[in-house]
């Protein structure tokens, strides 16, 4: 071996390439074996994670979160003092796109509002639907939103007037106050009906967000029967009523006039007469077809249906609530068109009127989704965010 190392130049000088088939076959086999050995070693290297056998979790750093943040700090959802999540649904690199659903869990006084909701509201980068259990958020953030963020041009530069002052873009502020109705704007669910499909959606919204009374309240038959009657009456109001009659108050009035007599199956109440007249004019009217299905019930059954309807809608008979729902000022369908802040003020100790807010939220989400899909091709011009306060079951 020592001789070979000392005289390597002489040995290599004498080597000549051989084209003998045995020599060539030996070389090919040797090359294949060498390649297999290299491949096996690389393969094993992929399976082994030396030094992290017990896990590789670690705390993230600024470089880890950076791809998920917008370069414009005002277009982020603040999570901590140094971490945030971009509001952009389509970032430059799609692999960093994330949904914007965030859950914050904490007890009373833990800072959910102070350290998450308020900083997010102060970004003023979208429309907001804010559940305000104590009515304090609108007092603390209202003036700021009324002034609005600085207006920017197409290039992202802050706009100024001729005198050099910054031009602001004020928010449209809406309030539904179920603690003090005298400080609330009006909300009329009928204002957002455009077709028969919307009537069915409204009926579902009413059923889901209110509750009946008694043993029959949760039985499928009675709920479906109630839906038939609500659908017929709401369709009649929307198609045949005057503009000032298109509200829940008229629905309650029609229910009050829908008397039935068990001993007299031929008795006609004022509502029966109205539908009979409508049927004579238009036998295929949507309201008529729904009402005829409801009228298949016998006198005793029809009376039970009316009692269920009356129990479900009883809270709407309160004078203050009737006034609130007489016409609409909310303009829910425009929240995705312009920067709007909708404050839903509710009591955190009394849930009596929470169903009103639940109805509004159900209708709002349906409206915005439909408008995004049908009008804007899937994306609203202004991003809309909901800050909802929920109590976890114990």
Describe the function of each predicted region:
Residues 98-390, 394:
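P-loop NTPase motor domains
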């Amino acid at each position: 071996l020592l001789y070979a190392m000392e005289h390597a130049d002489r040995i290599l000088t004498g080597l000549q390439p051989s084209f003998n088939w045995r020599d060539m076959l030996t070389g090919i086999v040797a090359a294949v074996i060498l390649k297999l050995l290299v491949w096996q070693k690389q393969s094993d290297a992929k399976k082994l994670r030396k030094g992290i056998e017990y896990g590789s979790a670690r705390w993230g750093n600024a470089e880890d979160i950076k791809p998920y943040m917008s370069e414009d700090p005002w277009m982020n959802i603040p999570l901590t003092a140094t971490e945030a999540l971009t509001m952009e649904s389509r970032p430059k690199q799609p692999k960093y796109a994330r949904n914007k659903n965030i859950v914050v869990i904490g007890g009373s006084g833990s800072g959910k509002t102070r350290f998450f909701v308020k900083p997010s509201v102060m970004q003023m980068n979208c429309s907001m639907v804010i559940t305000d259990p104590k009515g304090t958020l609108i007092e603390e953030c209202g003036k700021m939103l009324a002034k609005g963020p600085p207006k920017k041009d197409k290039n992202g530069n802050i706009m100024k007037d001729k005198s050099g002052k910054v031009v602001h873009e004020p928010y449209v502020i809406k309030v539904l106050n179920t603690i003090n109705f005298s400080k609330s704007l009006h909300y009329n669910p009928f204002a957002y009906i455009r077709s028969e499909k919307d009537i069915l959606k409204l009926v579902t919204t009413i059923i889901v967000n209110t509750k009946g009374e008694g043993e029959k309240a949760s039985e499928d038959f009675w709920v479906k029967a109630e839906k038939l009657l609500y659908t017929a009456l709401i369709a009649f109001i929307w198609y045949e009523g005057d503009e000032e009659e298109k509200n829940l108050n008229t629905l309650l009035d029609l229910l009050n006039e829908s008397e039935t007599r068990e001993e007299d199956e031929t008795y006609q109440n004022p509502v029966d007469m109205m539908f009979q007249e409508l049927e004579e004019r238009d036998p295929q009217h949507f309201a008529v077809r729904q009402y005829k299905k409801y009228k298949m019930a016998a006198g005793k059954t029809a009376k039970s249906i009316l009692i269920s309807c009356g129990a479900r809608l009883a809270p709407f008979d309160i004078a203050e609530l009737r006034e609130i729902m007489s016409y609409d000022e909310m303009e829910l369908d425009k929240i995705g068109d312009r920067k709007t802040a909708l404050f839903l003020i509710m009591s955190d100790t009394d849930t009596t009127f929470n169903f009103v807010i639940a109805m509004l939220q159900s209708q709002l989400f349906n409206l915005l989704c439909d408008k995004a899909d049908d009008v804007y091709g899937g994306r609203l011009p202004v991003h809309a965010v909901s800050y909802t306060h929920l109590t976890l079951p114990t």
